[in-house]
């Protein structure tokens, strides 16, 4: 060996040093630009171009969204595409999909998931961009067809990219459709394309991904992230990060009746936004686009207008004293029922919906959580009745008559000693058709029901239940009689007044088009009759779920500004929320919300129908019929919606008032008056490094090629004794701030505040190298502790898991102990790995429920070993994901590197 050795000279050593961080001293500016290059990656040099189909505008902000989104897709296996309503999410998603197909190869398969109303939009857009044959399309309620192999759908493992439109519909991880989607998203890819990835990519589209709670965001993130092996910078444990925010949010929701909690809800969502959302979300508001000079010039040159959404206009109606008294007394009866919390209540109990709650114990056993089910149904119906009262007196009277009828029918069942409980059978509807009870029972048996499962004698219920039914009937008869005397409708009078003098004023409504939304179809029928028959308007179009598809062409001709036709056949469209998504109504710039939706994000979606690319009016007017003071007192509709909407604004940086004049849109100030929020700041930083790339390519490539561990010492007169360290692996990057007291993770924008430097600034000699190395090593040690060790599922701290996961794991370990079957033991190990990594939401819940059947009875488990083996095997088939080696390769963070470090004198 020594005979083959080559002698090294001092010159050789110096030459080798030049190739390492020891051989070249970068300037602070060069290190700053190096961080921008590494952070923005392909976004800087990306020369992405696509042949746009005829009729599709070439918009710079959309192309940049494609570049950013594709990079997130590659880095995190998924993203939120959450540009505000009307900025072209479908087009952007399709361009990302086309780019993915080009990168991954001809065998790429895409699954597009959407609400039924959006099917044509997706199919047509994919055809337009030439990737229709690469995709299969499915409505969001039909995902079981993929899992069951029906209707010629490919196996879930054959899809490489999943696109989910209106993804906020999958916010609840306890729903069946969420479980189905998660199984599809987390299953491995068997077609190893050119990208050589066995992990699916997932695009979640929604202008409103936050619906009500922090849980909603967490659940959607878990469609493409695992809780324990999260790829998002600064998040070692996704559920761990969210759990504190979820608890705080629940506490604030309990306290909101007593005090204003809006600012505290803001803080929760601001933290979620900065720690998580910004890193996996492509989201631009209209303000973000207008704040960027390149984007602003681009849309101006193409004649695109972004209308101003003006503050909501309140339409308050005044009731006379007789109507007001009737209204208030009715609310009292609707909401003041006797409950455990309100034992003195004398109002409606909604007993008709609480039958299972009052079964005697020996009959109630077949219903799990019977008391909870009954009380929940009663609460839902109470809210429903108050909402109907707020919507229109007509709708409320109709619901009042229905509730009286079904309550009377239940009393009739008691008299005949034949009480039927079968929710799926729709007994109330059959009774409404005058079917006798014996006929209903015979009908149920033909449908596969056993008589003993649905038919109960009167004495199967506690005596209290029949008393409650009689109590409710008495109140309902009085209310019905009282409301039959009410012939006034001050709300409609207010609407008609504005229809005559305001809504069609050319100063505010140049196109002469009006859009009205109501949650209640009964209210729409009432309005349509009065508008057409009483007022005599022939230009009113009513759209509901029943006729939406049939009227699609008519809607486009009369209300879509992008459509060739400018028909004036219909100038008023009154509709339910069936048109709140996936349709253009932007020939209009005036929206009337006849009632306020319980789901506050619907308000954003409604306004989004008229605030779209192609809008021609300079302003958008948003009229609201607010709940009366009495209604607000009882159900706090206004306050609930405000809290939820403000939470959404804080998390996503919305750009307009939606609900009330009190609502303040967050202008999230960063560094100067021209930059409004973190998205603006990142766009500005990307523009800065792109300008260097375009103006001085030689310097750009020199900086890009700086070696790992490049370092600099600065003397700026501030930050004395601090260091910034940038650590990265194949999966995750982190910025650390190190001081004499320790190290802490900071986000990219915070790091940039320290690193930003001008080209002329020069470095200073290292005055304390020992401290610098200590800072660097401390940062590397923290990264290793938080990510490298945590990524080893065998070393996961059991306290990181929730109680359900711990119980599921305990059950699986017990199965391993009672069986000698090596295959069953291996299957249990695989499932425990899934649970430890937080891959599936419903898997631990299912195992927990299964464990409750055995109550830790090992003898019974041993006796049922064959059955348990089948169930465990079925679970593995259902909850299938990449094997351990594939997951390790996809999430390998075992070799972290120091990219740069910077210390301050």
Descriptions of predicted regions:
Residues 117-136, 224-228, 530-538:
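Conserved helix-turn-beta segment of the N-terminal RecA-like "Helicase ATP-binding" lobe
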Residues 1-84, 91-103, 107, 175-182, ...:
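ATP-dependent helicase/translocase motor core
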Residues 137-170, 174-200, 204-207, 216, ...:
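Inter-lobe coupling linker of SF2 helicases/translocases
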Residues 2, 21-28, 40, 615-905:
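C-terminal accessory region of SF2 helicases/translocases
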Residues 117, 138-147, 174, 518-522, ...:
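Conserved helicase motor
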Residues 90-95, 106-128, 211-215, 519-524:
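Conserved Walker A/P-loop ATP-binding site and its immediately adjacent core
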Residues 171, 208, 532, 536-634:
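Conserved RecA-like P-loop NTPase helicase motor core
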Residues 47-51, 55, 97, 299-319, ...:
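Conserved Helicase C-terminal RecA-like lobe
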